[in-house]
């Protein structure tokens, strides 16, 4: 699953609030402004011997340049970041009844940083709703990823049914006490519905159903032990749905006040931009999470799939993913080349929508490095050197 469980991430996250710059300047957000972190410990003799014994998993891999092409610009952070973060973090802590320690860890995860890059021009109230949705999707997703719904198809389907009912107006009014996760989603839906057109509301519903449908497929595959019985394209098809990018794009449309007519939204070029965004998030996550997945014994990862299915080394698998990232860039520009003009007013919104697709992928990339989501305090060095050290085999959890 692409979206990590909240609790494990809370322990590993690091704050990024000291490195913010708003869109009041032209510099945006600069990762190079951070103080270089202490260098990672170099592989010792035992680790080098491990490479000789297990050449498929060396002590380190060289990651591809994930900051190239459409990811090379410096993202802009919404100037309402600090106010929205304070409001949203307090609210979710109260709703979920977090104790002080969990609330502090949640604050360090800094989902507002992520939302602020997705919609740098969003007003404060809309940015707060985007943060609330991000909190919801992590909590909701965790139930299917590592929680009680992971291997319970009937219960998973019921949870999805009840969540869809919220958007259909057929659900009871939830409270923080009766069902906090559904309550958060219901509050987000209420706020979007109050200011959005029927077309935008339907788009929100459709993209969430798309996400939910693939979560249920994931649960079925988990129960059936099908993690490595599909090819790369089948894996990517599933992950495009479960990654959460499609509803995140709809969320960012709301935040930015974008209004693309449905017949334009349905054009293959815009659909391909959404698909590229989802693929970039998936590929970045699977490379950067590989070390943590090894430590936790998790194998739902493209790296592991490539290594097992095609008998590749870790480095060869990374290189394949690097080629897939470059192919995403090519697909992006080909899609834009086929995009027709609809006139000034519509084209303005189309270009804003295209930028949202790009910003969702780029925001995930910068957030993943900056907050210690996967790499802990080594994110800056991995970005600078391209070297990601892997844990010794003796430290691994047997899945």
Swiss-Prot record:
One GO biological process from the UniProt record?
farnesyl diphosphate metabolic process
Q: What is catalysed by this protein? A: (2E,6E)-farnesyl diphosphate + H2O = presilphiperfolan-8beta-ol + diphosphate
Q: Where is the composition biased (Polar residues)?
A: 28-37
Cofactors required: Mg(2+)
Q: What is the induction note for this entry? A: The botrydial biosynthesis cluster genes are co-regulated by the Ca(2+)/calcineurin signal transduction pathway, which is under the control of the alpha subunit BCG1 of a heterotrimeric G protein. Expression of the cluster is also positively regulated by the cluster-specific transcription factor BOT6.
* Leading EC class: lyase
Biased composition range(s): Low complexity: 15-27
UniProt entry keywords in alphabetical sequence: Lyase, Magnesium, Metal-binding, Virulence
Q: How is the cofactor bound?
A: Binds 3 Mg(2+) ions per subunit.
At which positions is Mg(2+) 2 bound? 141
- What EC identifiers does the entry list? 4.2.3.74
Does the record carry Metal-binding as a key word? yes
Family per record: Belongs to the terpene synthase family.
The record's note on its domains: The Asp-Asp-Xaa-Xaa-Asp/Glu (DDXXD/E) motif is important for the catalytic activity, presumably through binding to Mg(2+).
Its annotated function is as follows:
Presilphiperfolan-8-beta-ol synthase; part of the gene cluster that mediates the biosynthesis of botrydial. Botrydial is necessary for colonization of plant tissue by the T4 strain. It is a strain-dependent virulence factor since highly aggressive strains like SAS56 or B05 still retain substantial virulence when botrydial synthesis is impaired, since they produce also botcinic acid. The first step of botrydial biosynthesis is performed by the sesquiterpene synthase BOT2 which catalyzes the cyclization of farnesyl diphosphate (FPP) to presilphiperfolan-8-beta-ol (PSP).
Alphabetical list of PANTHER family matching this protein: BETA-PINACENE SYNTHASE-RELATED, TERPENE SYNTHASE
Name assigned to this protein: Presilphiperfolan-8-beta-ol synthase
UniProt source species = Botryotinia fuckeliana (Noble rot fungus)
- This protein's encoding gene: BOT2
